[in-house]
């Protein structure tokens, strides 16, 4: 009898703990908390992308061999790809903001960062596949890869017109992490 009660109590504890997790998972972070988390995720990403842009421009004009330029560009684009995935993952970890259409807002941010990650990955793969035997064709290939990257990057921008949230707009304007 005692064993049966202990087993029942143990099952009840597990059910209650699971229910508590489910209920706790229903409410997402406040708009301010979510905006702060997103800005903390995007700040290092922006810095990395800025560094990439500057470094790519330098590589395109530097007096290096095609093999050196290829190695440097592949490394730079791999870094941007990794930074984009890290930012995407951190936005995912921020959860869903407690606002109307919060799921769509979070998914939009994650989707945009995922598309950027993929664009950098494709640019890295394209440049890694270029032949470095002749400088002219190599740099033409690099320019084409960067042009494609820029188009894909522009196309991956988050369309905020459908995800407009006054609470999130205010939060992004107010939290110190976003300044």
Residues covered by each model-derived region:
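Short, charged, amphipathic alpha-helical segments
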Residues: 36, 67-78, 103-110, 114, ...
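Bacterial N-terminal signal peptides that target proteins for export
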Residues: 2-16
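Immediate post-signal-peptide N-terminus of mature secreted/exported proteins
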Residues: 27-78, 174-178
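C-terminal motif of bacterial Sec signal peptides marking the signal peptidase cleavage site
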Residues: 22-25
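Amphipathic alpha-helical coiled-coil/heptad-repeat segments
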Residues: 45, 52, 56, 80-83, ...
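Short, solvent-exposed, charged loop/turn and helix-capping segments
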Residues: 85-110, 122-134, 159
